[in-house]
């Protein structure tokens, strides 16, 4: 609640918010669990909408390989990660997310994200 209030206070045309995860994350993971994504959208209808959202695509196998952060200890099976990836690709196809190839080198990824941000400013 406090974060939402902070967003409302700071909501002006010159403010840029950068989130590491947002509504689409909740949607695709709930869909991977068999829930209806529209339900997730409905319960999040009062959350401020993003002007630009990215999906950084990597394979499920690469996701498991890169998941070395024991802070959160979040582990999903390959089968769930495949569904998650398919759902993200569905939303990129609908134009709700900007597709970024996460298998490319970090400099290339950074350039592509910066170009997309500049295009939307």
Q: Where in this protein do the model-derived segments appear?
A:
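Phosphate-binding/switch loop-helix module in NTP-utilizing enzymes
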Residues: 1-14
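NTP-dependent small-molecule kinase module
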Residues: 61-121
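Hydrophobic residues in alpha-helical segments
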Residues: 11-13, 31, 67, 92
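A glycine- and Lys/Arg-enriched "phosphate-lid" helix/loop adjacent to the NTP-binding pocket
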Residues: 21, 26-86
């Amino acid at each position: 609640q406090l974060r939402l209030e902070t967003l409302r206070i700071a909501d002006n045309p010159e403010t840029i918010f950068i989130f590491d995860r947002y509504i689409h994350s909740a949607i695709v993971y709930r869909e991977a669990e068999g829930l209806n994504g529209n339900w997730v959208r409905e319960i999040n209808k009062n959350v401020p909408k993003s002007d630009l959202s990215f999906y950084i695509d990597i394979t499920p196998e690469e996701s498991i390989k890169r998941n070395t952060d024991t802070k959160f200890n979040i582990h999903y099976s390959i089968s769930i990660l495949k569904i998650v990836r398919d759902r993200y690709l569905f939303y990129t196809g609908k134009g709700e997310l900007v597709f970024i190839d996460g298998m490319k080198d970090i400099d290339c990824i950074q350039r592509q994200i910066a170009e997309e941000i500049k295009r939307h400013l």
